[in-house]
Regions:
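A beta-strand signature from Gram-negative outer-membrane beta-barrel systems
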Residues: 1-37, 145-147, 160, 166-168
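Conserved small-residue
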Residues: 37-123, 214, 498-499, 505, ...
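Outer-membrane beta-barrel transmembrane strand signature
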Residues: 94, 98-153, 158-166, 242-300, ...
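Extracytoplasmic gating/loop element in the C-terminal half of outer-membrane beta-barrel translocons
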Residues: 123, 335, 405, 444, ...
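Solvent-exposed loop/turn segments connecting transmembrane beta-strands
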Residues: 142, 173-176, 445-450
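Extracellular/periplasmic, surface-exposed regions of secreted and cell-surface proteins
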Residues: 181, 187-196, 201-206, 215, ...
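Solvent-exposed loop segments that connect transmembrane elements
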Residues: 218-220, 225-227, 331-341, 520-531, ...
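C-terminal extracellular loops and terminal segments
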Residues: 593-597, 639-658, 718-728, 760-776, ...
Length: 885
């Protein structure tokens, strides 16, 4: 695999190279006898990143919950200590469950704020027994993974072949999230004539993915999200229904455990927080299965013409047929109220690429010349249809025909086309001086006719300084090559930016220049068409102008080698959307928002510490320093800035710039303080009216407990939150058949909004809900015994305690150990006697560990914020054997 990042290389690939190009070279047969390779590995999969550091002791949770109620009554309502004590204990019932047996006439929490020592964990109402379960331990498991690969290859003077077969089975880290994949590939080349070579590279993949719904960033706070619930549910709730003696009850029909959904149906208790929720129950009784059949075919014919010319025709076909079966059982959970639900969906994706190339290559003494001209067309079509029904007749039958009422159906067809003409030429003199030029004209169906075509240029220069006579005597230097390039690439694929904000249409970006309407009607009669997505016929190509200047070097007989690069990229006509007033009939419109610049330095250093016949030891280190800023905003934005939600886009500042109130800690009563502005008062009511201004017309700042004041009048910019530096460090070691490798990565100097932590620090306001867990940092909150804390007091009436502010900016620095591998290859002298070329045993750990600012927070998941709702990185420990003969 080769990553192309320089301006000339990426420009040649047009819009699909706008974010860099990854070249994957598939295996081909090597001349000689047939070679067979077999590789098998087995392993265990678990979570790399644990949950946040939450309260896990039921009594400790009740003490904090009591404190929230007590402080609310005592400080805000003005009740006496005795009255507040009584009311707070009564409010503990808002959790909906009783899991402690408390002596008659006594309270669960005493006047000292501690759990009643006479209370015993476990409670029965005569029908069921209630005791908390460890939801995290029950939800996440260490599971099995196995993978097998077999390849056969060979070649002669006119024919080469490579075929492979692989199978992967992975059970996932949560129940019902397993993955099976079966793949076959064949790569064949045949020299049909002295002047003609033809080839075929085909692959077929079949996958079955059990992918439970609502386990990603699009289902934050979902009652079915196992990650969110395991992170956030209080440690006081049963996961299972138990009989009066404490034994877990089982469903007679399926033999599965009966799960407590907290809805008052299975038992007499109902949760206040996330009622009708039990993700493990959903994962047990419900099912979402994705079946995919993927075909990839690439064919070519290459003709060697006269005088250094070659002509090549390439055809590529990718098809993806997927079927989704979504089954929500009729007995338990949210679908039980309407007898269960089934959804079947089938999607067919077809991508066709055709390419025609004319290449010229020749040498005239020390002058080397090459040129390439070509045309490329690309067509993508996606068709899908779905059906949905309720009232399931048979359990565990996932087909739509098993539903008996409330049928709905729909379908869509979407197409996207591009075409491109391109030319590139290169010249070098004696492999010393290099010149590259190129041009590409791309067209797309994503824009209106008058904006569909874009022109993109590139050029590059190179100088192999080691070839100069005045460096020949510098024996320590093996290579020193300077290079610089400028290239333009276009981007029309704003599907992500637009579609993810346009509702439920994943293809909105393909038609962003058009107004899209949704038809409505009943019983076959059309009634109306409503605007679904507002288009913009003035949209045009997003264009990136990239400049690179760098050097490749090698010293000491290639023991020390690497590269150093400076890059500058300016992306103009950036494709995005603009929020508008709903009075227009729509909330957003796609636009070319302006110009964004990215610049920085990146380097790579490799050093062979030991390099001889028996032992090799090398280290590698790479890093990138980068900066981002908005150079110019579209005239659609007034005053050179645009505010949307908690983000601000402003000329001269980073595109990753938050706009939030500044948190100042707490006041003398433990209330959250923010930097707001001084307000004029109504003389009659005493209520705030308008901000007070100084002589220059600026607001006068002051600390306030009124979050709305700070949010409306005095939000502050965060500045660039992106990491300043990121990179990796690794080492490899080999000695007499033994090999060892370790690879790590890091990032420094950035910030991220820790939404997962914020959720767990909620101790008041509308977000405060009995049954929602707390982070252990809540134990450090302000109290009369801890007045130095900057964490607001636990108080259910403090509605501003965890509002959006810079309080929850957290360092996004991390260091991760990504991979450790240890292997041993048996000596060839031992294997040759039994006809084996190579035999290697190995073990590896992937995603070993990550060290970040807070337990449970993984800064790799996003550039802007992290949540407790996402399917986290997985650690895989495996061992295997690789055999070649």
């Amino acid at each position: 695999m080769t990553v192309l990042k320089d301006a000339v290389s990426t420009s040649l690939y047009g819009s699909r190279g706008s974010n860099g190009v990854v070249m994957i070279t598939t295996k081909k047969g090597q001349q000689g006898r047939t070679q067979i390779t077999a590789d098998a590995k087995w392993g265990a999969v678990s979570r790399e990143v644990a949950n946040y550091d939450v309260i896990k002791n039921p009594g400790e949770y009740y003490e904090q919950l009591y404190k929230g109620y007590y402080n609310g009554y005592r400080y805000n309502s003005g009740f006496s200590a005795t009255k507040s004590f009584q009311l707070a204990n009564n409010d503990l019932s808002k959790t909906g469950y009783q899991i402690y047996t408390v002596p008659t006439g006594q309270y669960l929490v005493g006047k000292n704020g501690k759990l009643n020592p006479q209370a015993t964990l476990g409670y029965t109402d005569g029908t069921n027994y209630f005791t908390p379960d460890a939801w995290e331990d029950a939800t996440f498991k260490t599971t099995f993974r196995q993978e097998y690969n077999v390849g056969i290859s060979g070649a002669s003077d006119v024919f080469s072949y490579y075929s492979s077969f692989s199978y992967l089975q992975d059970d996932g880290t949560i129940k019902g999230s397993g993955f099976d994949r079966l793949t076959g590939r064949t790569n064949v080349e045949y020299k049909a004539k002295k002047w003609l070579t033809i080839g075929s590279n085909m692959a077929y993949t079949h996958t079955v993915s059990n992918s439970p719904l609502e386990q990603d960033e699009n289902s934050t706070n979902s009652s079915s999200n196992a990650f969110f619930i395991a992170n956030n549910i209080a440690p006081i709730y049963p996961m299972y229904v138990r009989d009066a003696t404490g034994n877990i009850m089982y469903d007679k029909a399926s033999g599965n455990k009966i799960y407590d959904y907290g809805d008052g149906e299975s038992t007499g208790f109902a949760r206040n927080w996330m009622s009708m929720s039990n993700p493990l129950g959903d994962l047990t009784y419900n099912k979402t299965e994705y079946n995919m059949d993927i075909f990839e075919g690439n064919w070519f014919a290459k003709a060697d013409l006269t005088h250094g010319f070659t002509a090549t025709v390439r055809l590529g076909l990718n098809t993806d047929n997927s079927i989704i079966y979504n089954y929500n059982n009729p007995l338990y959970g949210q679908s039980s109220s309407y007898g269960g639900e089934i959804m079947n969906e089938q999607t067919r994706t077809t991508a066709l690429t055709h390419q025609y190339l004319l290449n010229y290559q020749n040498a005239f003494g020390k002058h080397n010349v090459s040129a390439l001209a070509g045309f490329e067309g690309y067509r993508l079509k996606v068709t899908d249809f779905y059906g949905n029904g309720q009232q399931i007749y048979r359990m565990n039958d996932y087909m739509l025909g098993n539903s008996t009422s409330k049928f709905t159906a729909g379908g869509t067809k979407n197409e996207y086309h591009t075409a491109g003409y391109f030319f590139s030429g290169s010249y070098n003199y004696d492999e010393t001086y290099f010149v590259n030029i190129g041009y590409r004209r791309d067209g797309t169906s994503a824009f209106a006719k008058n904006n569909r075509w874009g022109n993109f240029f590139n050029f590059g220069l190179g100088w192999n300084m080691k070839k100069e006579s005045w460096l020949q005597d510098f024996e320590a230097l093996d290579q020193l090559k300077l290079r610089t390039s400028f290239g333009q690439t276009g981007n029309d694929n704003h599907n992500y930016n637009l579609a993810t904000t346009a509702g439920d249409d994943p293809y909105a970006g393909w038609y962003a220049y058009q107004d899209i309407f949704k038809m409505t009607g009943t019983d076959g009669v059309f009634s109306d068409g409503t605007l679904k997505n507002k288009g913009n016929a003035d949209l045009k190509w997003e264009k990136t102008n990239a400049f690179d200047f760098g050097a490749d070097y090698s010293f000491f007989k290639s023991r020390l080698y690497g590269s150093l690069d400076f890059f500058f990229r300016a992306t103009s006509n950036l494709l995005d959307f603009k929020q508008v007033a709903l009075i227009n009939g729509y909330s957003k419109i796609p636009i070319n928002m302006g110009t964004v610049q990215n610049y920085g330095v990146e380097f790579e250093i490799n050093y062979d510490i030991i390099k001889n016949h028996d032992m090799q030891w090398s280290v590698n280190f790479n890093g990138t320093w980068t900066k981002n800023r908005i150079h110019k905003l579209s005239s659609d934005y007034e005053n050179g800035q645009y505010i949307t939600g908690n983000r601000i886009y402003k000329e001269g500042e980073s595109i990753y710039n938050f706009y939030l109130p500044k948190y100042l800690g707490v006041n003398e009563n433990g209330e959250a303080l923010y930097l707001g502005v001084k307000m004029n008062k109504d003389p009659e009511t005493g209520k705030d009216t308008t901000p007070v201004k100084d002589e220059e017309g600026n607001y006068i700042e002051e600390a306030t407990t009124d979050y709305d004041n700070a949010y409306e009048y005095n939000r502050k910019e965060s500045g660039d939150i992106l990491p300043k530096v990121y990179g990796g460090l690794g080492t490899t070691f080999a000695w007499k058949g033994l090999d060892f490798a370790i690879q790590t990565s890091f990032q420094l100097g950035g910030r991220i909004y820790d939404q997962g932590y914020s959720d767990l620090m909620t101790t008041g306001g509308t977000s405060f809900s009995a049954g929602h867990n707390f982070h252990k940092d809540v134990l450090k909150a302000w109290s009369e015994d801890n007045t130095s804390s900057n964490i607001p007091r636990v108080d259910f009436t403090d509605k501003y305690a965890t509002s959006f502010s810079d309080r929850f900016y957290t360092s996004s620095d991390y260091f991760s150990i990504d991979n450790i591998t240890l292997g041993y290859t048996l000596p060839k002298s031992l294997l040759s006697r039994i006809g084996i070329q190579s035999l290697r045993f190995y073990g590896s750990i992937e995603n070993v560990a990550i060290f970040s600012a807070r337990k449970g927070m993984d800064p790799r998941m996003s550039l802007t914020y992290v949540s407790s709702s996402w399917y986290t990185a997985r650690r895989t420990i495996s061992g295997g054997i690789k055999l070649t003969f």
